[in-house]
Amino acid sequence: MGRAGRIVRGIMVLGSVLLLASCGDSFNDAYCEANNHRNQQTVEHLTNVLEQKRNQPGLYLARARCHYFLGAYAQALQDASEVIRRLPNKADAYLLRAKAGKMLGQIPQALQDYSAAIKFQPTAEAHYGRGLKYLREYQGKDREALEDFTAAIRLDPKHVGAHAFRAQIYSRHEQFQHALADSETVLKLDPTTTNAYCNVGFAHYALGHDAEGRKFLTTCYQKDPDPQTRGYYETEVNKVLYARKPKRNSGGNYVAEGGVKTPYDREMERQQN
């Protein structure tokens, strides 16, 4: 791009920022996006305008968003906090501060900010973000995470991440039919999600659909040849297969895991007698 083109582009960005300033919050944080090559230029112009118009919370929120996408999380948090100071009910500011705080390792504060964002304006993104914090950072919070992922799906049925992590929780608690349904949804929404093939395959095994399970696991290993992936899922499958085998109790009789006799257990006892 020539010098004239750069000048025109700069004028366009500056014009957008000035329009943002004149409209207050109405344009909010719309001028920076992930991987946008103009983000740095936009944040510089926002900073210049803020030197003249410090009474515009919308400009601070816009700059916070730019800082976030540029990886300047401390600055993003600072600008979002300024918006919250001026507009204590601004859900977008709490959500952005939660995301920046998460990247800075401020987990308890991030969790509080996600909750505030949900209180003032429930969104799939806020529920999903809080659900991830419960799942990854806290022990014994699976129920809370599950509720958040379910809320995110209710608000956005096509939220791939919420379906994927809800499937993970269902599988952990041996609710394999639900885990299978969510993992299948992930594949429908995004067939490039490689581990979803493995998750569908394992859920089929857990439900006794071995042939179907093996088909999906084979596809998963073809798409992801990492030996660690195969090792993990084959170990989980072997656990399922081992759990199916009848065990002998102290009296020499066959009994299933947990001490509850199944028709298969009783048949094994009959054959032994």
Regions found by a protein language model. Give the residues of each.
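Short coil turns that delineate tetratricopeptide repeat
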Residues: 54, 88, 121-122, 157, ...
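Helix-start (N-cap) detector for alpha-helical repeat units in TPR-like alpha-solenoids
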Residues: 57-58, 91-92, 124-126, 160-161, ...
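Terminal, low-structured helical/coil segments at or just beyond the last alpha-helical repeat
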Residues: 214-273
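Canonical tetratricopeptide repeat
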Residues: 62, 96, 129, 165, ...
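Structural signature of tandem alpha-helical TPR/SEL1-like repeats
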Residues: 36-44, 71-82, 103-116, 137-151, ...
